[in-house]
Amino acid sequence: MPPGVNIATIFMLLVILVAIGLIWLHHARALRGRITPQRPLPALDALRAALGRAAETGQAVHLSPGASVLGASSGVRSAATELVAGLLLAEQAAAQAARNGTPILVSSGDVVAHLALRGGIRQAFQQAGQAQDFEPARVQLLTHHDELAYVTGVTTLYGRQPLEASAMLGGFGQEFMLVGEDGAQRGIPQVVGTTSTTGLPLMLLTTPATLIGEEIYASEAYLAPSGPAQARLLTQDVLRTAVIVLLIGGLVYSLIQPYLGLPPLPGL
């Protein structure tokens, strides 16, 4: 190999090219209607049903990506991927709400998330042809970089007006017990999800409609029509399967390598 060429860099470029190719392939398949059947996620079925009921009752559905932040420093929960998953779910739910005429109430605990929500939900209403129904006041910033203050603000929203349901996906920890228990006592159906090992047990205690771990990253594709979201989900599944196969293959190779006199794997 020529001097100055990094094997790791070449490998990463190949992975990126493969990922782009898979997204393009799956997007083309989705546009042709060739979508792989998805396993059911009851929590998202409950959210879909709540959006339909809210159009009839006139009660709002609360949407939230939590109090996760982007580019968090030490001492602040860094859950950028969870935040993005929550933002995408909120936008897809808002798009469905715009088509159904469902009132929504959106809250966040980070300035960046708040701006992203306002822009994304405005765009969702515009694409649904209901731009006149978008109300900026329905997208609220409750706090900034303070998880406990944020869930306290959500409980205030719960007590201020009747809600048809509340969907909260993002970075939640022990503070979720405050809002989860309050919602359960008020009889508000809650659809929740996180990857946090401290937040998940509390979610399972307060609501059966819980997305566990990586299920939150698939939520957008379950609510979105066929297209880019489906392509991203299928690509993630393929890459995840490939990583698992490589890990198992590497483990087996490392076990048999000393006995068969095979060359060691690079970097080991």
Language-model segments: which ranges?
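Hydrophobic alpha-helical transmembrane segments of small proteolipidic membrane proteins, enriched
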Residues: 2-42, 256-257
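Membrane-interface segments at loop-to-transmembrane junctions
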Residues: 38-47, 231-236
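Acidic, Ser/Thr-rich low-complexity segments on the non-lumenal side of membrane proteins
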Residues: 47-93
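Gly/Ser/Thr-rich loops at beta-strand to alpha-helix junctions
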Residues: 66-72, 83-84, 110-114, 169-176
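Long, charge-dense
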Residues: 96-98, 102-151
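Membrane-proximal low-complexity regions enriched in glycine and acidic/polar residues
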Residues: 128-186
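Extracytoplasmic/lumenal ectodomains and periplasmic regions of secretory and membrane proteins
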Residues: 165-214
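C-terminal functional extensions of proteins
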Residues: 198-200, 204-268
